[in-house]
Every structure is written in C-alpha cells, then in structure tokens.
Regions:
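Proline- and Ser/Thr-rich low-complexity, intrinsically disordered segments
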Residues: 1-295
Length: 295
C-alpha cells in the first residue's frame, strides 16, 4: 500500500506514479466507492480514500492488486483582496471587513513596510498603503494571502470656535482671524440667520451674533464647522462741544442741555479747575465760568 497527502488546490496527478515497486502498465483503477477511475486524481474534485490498481493475471496466475490511499487537506482561505477609503480623523476600522470571499478568521496582518499589524486601522496613527492578510496552511498546503489597499483622505479643518467683543466704532475685520487652531482658508461663512456672508465684519453695520464657518470635506470625510460669536458694544456718546453765554442772574440749568449732538446721560462733569462738578447743574450766579468737560 502507498499513500499520499495533497492539498485540494494542487494540480491533477497520476495515481500510477505513486505505486511502489515496478508495476505493470495497462491495469485498471477502482475508486473508493467501487466505481471505475481513469487513474488521474484531481484534488478538490476527486474523492479522497483508497484507490485500487488491478492488473489482470494470465491463467493460472491470479489478478494482482495494489492500493494508493489519498488524503486531501483543504487550502487556507485568505479571502479576496479589497480596498478601503477612510477619513484622516475617522474612527478605527477593522481591515478584515474589507475582504470578501469568506476569509478564514485567525490570520495575521502586515503593514505596508512588512511589520506586524493588529488589523484595526487607526487613521490617526496608521499610514495609507497595502495591508496584507495571511492565513497559514496545513501541510502540504501553503499559506495564502490577500490585501486591503487603504486610501486616507485628509479631513477638512475649520479651526476651533472663537469669540470677540468689539465697539461699534471699530474698523472692519475678518472673522477668520478670530478662529483658533489651524483652519483652512477654503471655507465659507454663514450669518446668524444662515445666509451667505463674506467673512468681513463691519461693527455698527453687521449684526452681532454667532457666525458659522464651514469647510467642505471630500468623501468619506464630513464637512467641518466652527463658530465665531461676536458681541458689539455701543460706543459712549458725550455729544459735541458747545459754548454758552449766560447772564449772572439767570436760573440754574444743566450743562448737558447745552451740548450738541445726542449725548448719553449718566456721564460725569469736571469744572474749569479740573475738579468734579457733580450733576452738571450750572448756577450762573455761583458757578465759575470756563470750560466744563463732560465724560
């Protein structure tokens, strides 16, 4: 009896070559189930088991038989190679899920540089490239490998939220300068009412509120958004300078009524002697003449 173990993915072979000794050619083969066989074993198709070779004897010699036992080992299945596209700031992804063809679990992964990899691709750490999955074979079957080609798309960067408080008399400025981080300059702005906006804020004209900055992402990366909150304070109004000539016997009056413009109330007065002049009530018969300052 002779025997052999083959891999189910091996090429077809002749059973006759496995017989020991110096067998006569021209015999017949019988398969394990008793059916006829042409003497060619096709791994993955032919049934494993004992194949009998028979050479007919010439009377009074009996027939001669020999047996070849074939065992078949299934090859490892590493699946069918695939591809994966991830965002550079996305979550970790199991590379195994990018393989098709029912791959066997328990294989090993290698990075593009050939070093070992756990199989969980982290876009924040791992490099793009070809990752190889290998499933070890049981002799005589060799190991098999498949690959996942990973492409990493750079995530959009809208920076971090910012806030600013300005006076309504300040010069126009760019909201972009208020953002933190390292925002890309390719984004667009929206007003608090979600209308398109140029990004140039003009205090006293542009309304205060929360402005949105959006940088578009390339698939599979989503858009990135940041916000700038703008508070606008109204500048104080002390009115415009004025002069007033009064008679010494006139009634007391409030100096604010003599200022030009539309001054805010609640300010403070300073007399000609640079001393506080509480209330701003000017008594022509008592108060000294001169320049009174309203702040």
């Amino acid at each position: 009896k002779d025997s052999t173990t083959v891999c189910a993915s091996d090429a077809p072979f002749s059973l006759f070559a496995l017989l020991g000794g110096s067998p006569d050619a021209g015999g017949t083969w019988t398969a394990p189930g008793g059916g006829a066989n042409n003497g060619t074993f096709v791994p993955g198709t032919s049934v494993a088991g004992a194949y009998t070779y028979t050479v007919a004897g010439t009377s009074p010699c009996a027939n001669a038989n020999a047996t070849v036992t074939v065992s078949v080992v299934q090859p490892p299945n590493a699946g069918i190679s695939g591809s994966l596209t991830v965002c550079s700031n996305g979550p970790a992804v199991n590379l195994f899920n990018s393989l098709t063809g029912s791959p066997a679990v328990g294989g090993t992964w290698q990075r593009p540089n050939g070093t070992s990899h756990p199989g969980l691709f982290d876009p924040l750490v791992d490099v793009a490239g070809t990752y190889t999955y290998t499933v070890a074979g049981t002799l005589p079957c060799a190991s098999r490998s498949s690959t996942v080609q990973v492409t990493k798309v750079q995530a959009p960067e809208a920076g971090t939220n910012g806030s600013i408080t300005v006076c309504n008399t300040q010069a126009p400025f760019q909201l972009f300068t208020v953002l933190g981080g390292t925002p890309s300059g390719s984004g667009t702005w929206r007003t608090p009412a979600n209308a398109p906006f140029s990004g140039t804020f003009t205090p006293g004209t542009t309304p205060a509120g929360i402005y949105k900055y959006v940088v578009l992402g390339n698939a599979p990366c989503p858009n990135d958004t940041s916000f700038v909150t703008v508070v606008v304070n109204t500048a104080p109004n002390a009115g415009t300078n004025a002069t007033s000539t009064v008679c010494s016997d006139q009634a007391t009056f409030n100096l604010i009524t003599r200022l030009g413009g539309t001054p805010n109330t609640g300010g403070t007065w300073t007399g000609p002697d640079n001393q506080p002049f509480p209330g701003g009530a000017y008594d022509p018969g008592v108060s000294q003449p001169g320049a009174y300052t309203y702040t």
